[in-house]
């Protein structure tokens, strides 16, 4: 915000004074928004979850999409230029879902079909374990027909038993969540000390939920079930 205001002031200083800045002229001074909130649109169907990531440009929101495909052979397709660690995270997420299907109201028949996980921005390479909880959420959302709430973002590695493990880049990820309009963020318990590095204005805009198990996210981040329990993303 400070950088945008400074940019506007520099441009105003070049104008004939006195100058009046209103809503319309402010758009011309600072340009089009770099970050457009899209979580509500993207998570409008079951099978899509909003994760938080760190890129070379800082923090970003990473959407994970899950789809159930026709067929009778169980398999997992991964797309989006994912690195080896991220591919392993997807396999772990699916193994957790399979092992705890009954607990989360998922029928065994659904897991007999092929599944596809995709991370958009396919031209951009992606890697790391921190999308594990987001992949788990996308799969459970798809297979239960329950949307992930649009205001929810999350980050964390997931284990086969559902433990949420620590990740890096907490400050950058929460800044990205604030820009994207996400207000409920799930963060690994062991990352709680990292909140000391997050600006106060960011923490004022988001509610950080500290979790140690993926079940804690599943209990509160999903909306009501749709009439169809398997809706493709």
Where on the chain are the PLM-derived regions?
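C-terminal helical "lid" of AAA+/P-loop NTPase domains
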Residues: 2-14
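Peripheral, non-AAA+ core regions of ATP-driven protein-machinery
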Residues: 18-24, 32-50, 57-233
């Amino acid at each position: 915000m400070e950088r945008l205001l400074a940019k506007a002031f520099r441009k105003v200083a070049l104008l004939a004074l006195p100058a009046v800045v209103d809503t319309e002229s402010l758009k011309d001074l600072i340009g089009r928004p770099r970050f457009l909130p899209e979580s509500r649109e993207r998570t409008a169907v079951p099978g899509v979850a909003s994760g938080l990531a760190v890129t070379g440009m800082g923090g970003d929101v990473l959407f994970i999409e899950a789809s159930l495909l026709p067929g009778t052979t169980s398999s997992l397709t991964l797309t989006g230029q994912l690195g080896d660690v991220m591919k392993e995270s997807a396999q772990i997420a699916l193994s957790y879902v399979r092992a705890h299907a009954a607990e989360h109201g998922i029928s065994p028949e659904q897991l007999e079909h092929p599944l596809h996980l995709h991370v958009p921005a396919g031209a951009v390479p992606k890697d790391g374990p921190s999308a594990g909880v987001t992949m788990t959420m996308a799969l459970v959302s798809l297979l239960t027909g329950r949307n992930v709430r649009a205001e929810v973002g999350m980050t964390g590695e997931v284990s086969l038993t559902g433990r949420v493990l620590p990740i890096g880049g907490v400050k950058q990820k929460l800044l990205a969540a604030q820009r994207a309009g996400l207000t409920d963020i799930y963060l690994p318990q062991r990352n709680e000390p990292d909140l000391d590095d997050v600006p106060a204005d960011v923490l004022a805009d988001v509610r950080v939920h500290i979790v140690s198990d993926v079940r804690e996210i599943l209990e509160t981040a999903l909306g009501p079930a749709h009439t169809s329990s398997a809706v493709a993303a």
